[in-house]
């Protein structure tokens, strides 16, 4: 699974350059499991070949990360009672998550939100989903944006530098991320399920 996605990502970036980096990094931060561990190192490799500029790549990746994160934050902020919490109340026991645990996580985020928002940007997989609890806890959006930008800047700069340094061996990072195939597959399954749910809901409304 990861190989197919990596192949598509590299072709996309090779064709469109900076716009492709922006789109991919935005999606990754907006709950779509597009691995930045592929996007940014490959962009770094292109920097080493003279096709892209290092700091422009880092800035584009960081801004895209912020944009996508704000989208996920808004989903958590505005949709918590309408969708997420209701879902957990009803079905949480089937995925080993209770409503009380969600409430506890929110309180923890309220107390240490800045640290979590920053540190989570340096963690694979977690960084894709951390914006939701930030929205749940109604973390100050300006603080969230600042710490997200700061953490994302470090992450994108590090991955770009790794790709630049490794050169043609940039994809060596890929062998360490096969373990996350299950998260990628689960992400696409969830998206497909949401799409079908919306379609069915629209059909029911039109019939009523």
State each model region's role.
Residues 125-129, 149, 153-156:
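Hydrophobic alpha-helical transmembrane bundles that constitute the permease/transmembrane domains
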Residues 22-40, 120:
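Transmembrane alpha-helix interface/packing and boundary motifs in multi-pass membrane proteins
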Residues 158-169:
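Transmembrane alpha-helical segments of integral membrane proteins
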Residues 141-146:
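Amphipathic cytosolic juxtamembrane alpha-helices at the membrane-cytosol interface
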Residues 1-22, 50-132, 136-139, 168-189, ...:
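Membrane-interfacial helix-loop-helix
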Residues 10, 40-48:
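Short amphipathic helix-loop junctions that connect adjacent transmembrane helices
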Residues 22, 29, 42, 129-133, ...:
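Alpha-helical transmembrane segments of multipass membrane proteins
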């Amino acid at each position: 699974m990861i190989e197919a996605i990596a192949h598509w990502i590299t072709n996309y970036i090779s064709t469109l350059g900076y716009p492709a980096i922006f789109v991919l990094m935005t999606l990754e931060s907006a709950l779509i499991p597009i691995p930045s561990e592929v996007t940014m190192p490959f962009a770094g490799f292109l920097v080493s070949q003279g096709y892209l500029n290092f700091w422009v790549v880092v800035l584009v990746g960081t801004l895209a990360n912020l944009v996508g994160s704000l989208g996920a934050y808004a989903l958590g902020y505005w949709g918590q009672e309408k969708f997420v919490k209701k879902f957990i109340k009803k079905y949480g026991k089937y995925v080993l998550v209770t409503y009380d645990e969600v409430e506890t996580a929110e309180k923890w985020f309220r107390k240490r939100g800045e640290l979590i928002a920053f540190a989570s940007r340096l963690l694979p997989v977690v960084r894709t989903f951390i914006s939701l609890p930030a929205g749940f806890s109604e973390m100050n959006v300006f603080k969230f944006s600042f710490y997200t930008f700061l953490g994302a800047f470090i992450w994108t700069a590090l991955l770009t530098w790794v790709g630049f340094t490794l050169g043609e061996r940039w994809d060596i990072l890929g062998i360490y991320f096969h373990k996350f195939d299950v998260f990628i597959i689960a992400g696409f399954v969830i998206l497909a399920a949401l799409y079908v749910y919306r379609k069915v809901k629209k059909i029911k409304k039109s019939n009523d």
